[in-house]
């Protein structure tokens, strides 16, 4: 099968995200990468659910993990009858989709399709595990291909020799904008906000750009205004975990304040991604609240005295008036007109 992860950084190659083989799913532990390259092995789909909830894989990594988790679920009930297998896979589809609430709708598009594929395979006398793995790779190929178009559009917006600022880890878009920039013979500098508390910007995004030859600088999250004022930032960009049809987007916590600063300094902010058809407004966006202990410590080392409390919303919502454009596979949309994305046929994405 043709794959779309060719010439991608290590982090974005399918097997280095999550992969099913011989009754196990192995997931790259992004919590410790790049200090260590270690994979978490899951022998039940329930362990995959827990790994996603525990942030073993982040950004778009769960899109791969949930599909491979469905293959593992099919393996778990390989000796059962068709009806029992189907019931088990329906439950697995729900559990995997809801491993993290903010993106449950996106994960569900993958998991429920995997359940359908397994049922079709059983009816045809084929191996449902193999069918699910093939379906997941096809889903990855669709997403990577679509995001390549998005990456092409984003690269066109970046000035030659310019400087961009990123937030968190945009996963596929990072790889596709790098490929697009190379094709366009375009070079630029990259500033990566570290993205507390998991440091995805420092650990994941910066490495992808640096390994592909871009001049890359990491800043702490509280240096954003300084960098925008003094380091010649031309463009701020992020992906989004949810893009509502009214132009509101949800992304990693801290994106909202960065968008405010970009507006203050007159720096365009471009969001990349595909709008969510079932998210009509910001009221449809669910913000995941995580264990505040993850803010009070880093890698098990406490940062505060025991009496101190914390909060940890995983995402915040950016209103459309702070967004210069939403970069999609159909071009760049003014956020207030984003609903028009659905005026014409929408390609299957997940």
Regions found by a protein language model. Give the residues of each.
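Electropositive phosphate-/nucleotide-binding environments in soluble metabolic enzymes
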Residues: 42-49, 60-64, 83-86, 90, ...
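Long amphipathic alpha-helical segments
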Residues: 8-124
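Conserved phosphate- and dinucleotide-binding cores of soluble alpha/beta proteins
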Residues: 193-350
